[in-house]
Amino acid sequence: MNIRELAAEIGVSPATVSIVLNDRPGVSEETRKRIKDAIDKSGYAPAIRKKKAIHQILMLKCVLGEGLLTEENQGFVGMIIDACMQTLTEKGYSPTLMRVQLDTEGMLDHIEFEKYEGVIVIATEIQEKQFKMLEKIPIPFVCVDNMMPGMEYSCVGIDNEENVRIALEYAAECGYKRIGYLKSSYDAQNFEERTRAFYRFAEMYHLEVKKEDEIALTSSMMKAFEEMKIYLDSHEKEEIPPCFFADNDIIALGAMKAFRHRNYEIPADVAIVGFDDIPYSAVCSPSLTTVQVSRQLIGRVAARQMSERLLDEQYKKVKTKISGNLVVRTSMKKYR
């Protein structure tokens, strides 16, 4: 019998059983006694054998394929994880990082969740068709970097709509009337939200987007560079929009390299605004104007949300969106 089956038999949530097994506050004495009695009667391991001197939290990094977003995005996700683990440690928890492949069948089935009190899911690469699999997690969990629309999960992520608005508002303020879209070809929830926001705010700020101005690029600097060169070789210079918004900095930087390789001046011939503010964006030449999102804040908020859920079984599931700010550098200019 596992913790989920035990909880169903008693008529409480797995989170409530976990609280009792770990001798933590947040459950009434009556409920605590009922659960302990059921544990003894069922033969399930007694609470005293499950009590841990240090409260363990599982950091579950979910990776799809090569992990273009979690492994190759210049430490964006890594900074979130570091901030989350540091905050958990400060609160007296012991976080353990585990990497799982999303394309592995039954990837959650062999995880010993009973060793942990809660799970923080690094959900950057989890696709919509995979959202429901997280229902298998029998203990409290918080999803990070994916708002999981349609699911009643606690989540902490990026306010993609507002952050895209910030970027396009600046493009309009600079005087641009037409904008291109360097769209990620990678299927991720964050990118889907940015796509919807891009077209919504392009219309709001009267920025023309031609059908051919949407260019799908891989979220890898080298691949985006090669793909953008192919695009430029098939288009005349006067056909290229004077400004582009990119789904993330990796794509923007790859495209910028391709523009320079094909003798475009940035921002004189073409301007670019990115999204994420990864470290290289500040030191490349020209430096990249981009929307900065605090990775540290996302991590800290996720850790605090996890802690609050564990301390209070009545804690409501919360979805928290983190806004950003524009970092103006030299890849954009006032347009004539």
Which residues make up each language-model segment?
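Short acidic/polar active-site loop segments enriched in Thr and Asp
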Residues: 13, 45, 117, 176-178, ...
